[in-house]
């Protein structure tokens, strides 16, 4: 199981030999520094602890600074544990962990929209816009909770109402790695990834491969990438 933390740069497109444009997300991966190694004998599980995104010392408290000093590492903003990954303390995980043609899972927080109305949040229909309709064009309307008898005198949990929208942890599975630029610490992934520009993205090698890349143009593009990389070596 291969895992990396990266930063979403934005989206672009790559072109196949026939001129087909393929949408791609660009991820910048600063080398992930291994800070500690968890073992079954000592900790009850096997994992490695990595640090990502170098920051100034004044941004962290003394306990965290001591942890980084013990690992002989620069201060990092994010600390994450990866299970089923073998590495030594002080090692650096780079984009070279992945290769073109591989399928990965991308996990990130979606864009936050704050407190949002029911029309945008739940795709409700708007009220009548004709003359005499009054103000409530974007109101929720009746939520079908009556008074007395067999009808509930409360609002059920899960009722679709205005509220916080977005900033949810979402995993997009089986995304294709189009290209890996090791010199620039960049990785290009086919399709979209949750989150705004600058958000932190967790990349993992796919566990459950639901499909095989069947687009012949994309397959040829990956084959040409592989042959060119072998020629450069």
Curated annotation (Swiss-Prot):
Q: Which GO terms describe its biological process?
A: translation
Keywords, alphabetical: Ribonucleoprotein, Ribosomal protein, RNA-binding, rRNA-binding
Task: Tell me the superkingdom of the source.
Answer: Bacteria
Any matching Pfam family: Ribosomal_L3
Claim: Ribosomal protein is one of the keywords in the record: yes
Q: Which Gene3D superfamilies match?
A: 3.30.160.810, Translation factors
**Molecular function GO labels:** rRNA binding; structural constituent of ribosome
Its job = One of the primary rRNA binding proteins, it binds directly near the 3'-end of the 23S rRNA, where it nucleates assembly of the 50S subunit.
Question: Which proteins does it associate with, and in what oligomeric form?
Answer: Part of the 50S ribosomal subunit. Forms a cluster with proteins L14 and L19.
The entry's family comment says: Belongs to the universal ribosomal protein uL3 family.
The protein depicted here goes by the name Large ribosomal subunit protein uL3
| Species annotation | Ureaplasma parvum serovar 3 (strain ATCC 700970)
